[in-house]
């Protein structure tokens, strides 16, 4: 959660430098297939594939369009396009992303395979409930506080929820360029006392956030997949997810909402918090569902894609 990496003073120079360094590192070696993940490795993937005479498979976890919408960086979009054009096969993390790749880059749909992400099984759950600092129900947003993640819609929905459940507490955990605006919006709406902004969480802090929340909300504007809802479900937490997300394709036991429909989002939050039977049913069914959404299943789906590329 948040942005902690530093890629150098010139990101594009770093991407080009990495491509050349990677190509030198593997010079003279033979490969059957090259698999590159997202735009920062696409130039390296293309360079290595050309030198090795091997097919290139590019894996799209997100597009620049997801992160920036119509304000997308043209240079990043150009690098994405180069990788997608050169690749023998493209893998998208969802049908949502598959469609977006087709619309933004005109990549043929029959060139794009879909392999959904998964989540690691959790053997134990640390108990943090005794550490709750609020007597009211807790609603969690955990992610980058950026345009893509829809934080403004979470705040707007929170204001509506508080009209029905005044003691509810909303946690916006994460950092990003929209954080100051969200803090100002919370103040303008007069709901400062009901909001917490703990910043960028790590490790046990993330576990504590999931464990002490009563519901997790992912209101993303454009989410290629979205692993956080699966993580929340692994903590037996009911989740509400944007329909504009890949994870909504694989989840049956989650409430779904268009990111812009803050009235419905608020109604769903209220329903989960005020209807114990609904909450219990969602948790019990999701507990079984999450067992089948794991990384081993994703890996198994990759095998026939590899085989297809290698057969030519």
Model-predicted regions and their roles:
Residues 1-28:
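A conserved catalytic-core segment of Leloir-type glycosyltransferases
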Residues 234, 238-241:
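Short hydrophobic beta-strand element within catalytic cores of glycosyltransferases
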Residues 91, 132-158:
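Conserved donor-binding/catalytic core segment of Leloir-type glycosyltransferases
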Residues 221:
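Aromatic "clamp/platform" in nucleotide-sugar-dependent glycosyltransferases that forms part
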Residues 96, 118:
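Carbohydrate-associated surface elements
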Residues 254-263, 271-276:
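Conserved acidic donor-binding segment of nucleotide-sugar-dependent glycosyltransferases
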Residues 200-201, 208-213:
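Short alpha-helical donor nucleotide-sugar binding micro-motif in glycosyltransferases
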Residues 181-201:
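Nucleotide-activated donor-binding/catalytic signature segment of Leloir-type glycosyltransferases, i.e.
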């Amino acid at each position: 959660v948040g942005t902690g990496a530093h890629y150098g003073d010139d990101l594009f120079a770093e991407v080009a430098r990495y491509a050349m360094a990677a190509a030198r590192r593997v010079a003279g070696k033979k490969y059957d297939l090259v698999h590159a993940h997202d735009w920062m490795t696409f130039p390296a993937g293309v360079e290595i594939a050309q030198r090795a005479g091997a097919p290139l498979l590019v894996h799209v976890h997100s597009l620049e369009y997801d992160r920036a919408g119509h304000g997308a960086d043209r240079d990043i979009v150009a690098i994405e396009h180069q990788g997608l054009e050169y690749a023998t096969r493209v893998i998208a993390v969802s049908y949502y992303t598959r469609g977006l790749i087709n619309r933004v880059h005109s990549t043929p749909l029959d060139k794009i395979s879909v392999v959904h992400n998964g989540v690691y099984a959790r053997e134990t759950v640390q108990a943090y409930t005794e550490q709750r600092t609020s007597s009211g129900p807790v609603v969690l947003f955990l992610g980058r506080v950026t345009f893509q993640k829809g934080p403004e819609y979470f705040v707007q929905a929170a204001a509506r929820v508080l009209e029905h459940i005044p003691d509810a507490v909303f946690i916006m955990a994460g950092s990003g360029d929209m954080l100051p605006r969200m803090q100002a919006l919370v103040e303008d709406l007069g709901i400062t006392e009901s909001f917490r902004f703990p910043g960028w969480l790590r490790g046990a802090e993330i576990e504590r956030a999931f464990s002490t929340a009563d519901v997790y909300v992912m209101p993303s504007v454009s989410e290629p997949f979205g692993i956080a809802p699966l993580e929340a479900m692994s903590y037996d937490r009911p989740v509400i997810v944007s329909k504009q997300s890949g994870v909504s394709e694989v989840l049956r036991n989650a409430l779904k909402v268009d990111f812009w429909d803050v009235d419905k989002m608020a109604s769903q939050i209220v329903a989960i918090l005020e209807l114990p039977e609904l909450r219990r049913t969602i948790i019990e069914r999701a507990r079984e569902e999450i067992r089948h959404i794991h990384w081993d299943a994703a890996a198994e789906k990759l095998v026939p894609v590899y085989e297809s590329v290698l057969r030519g």
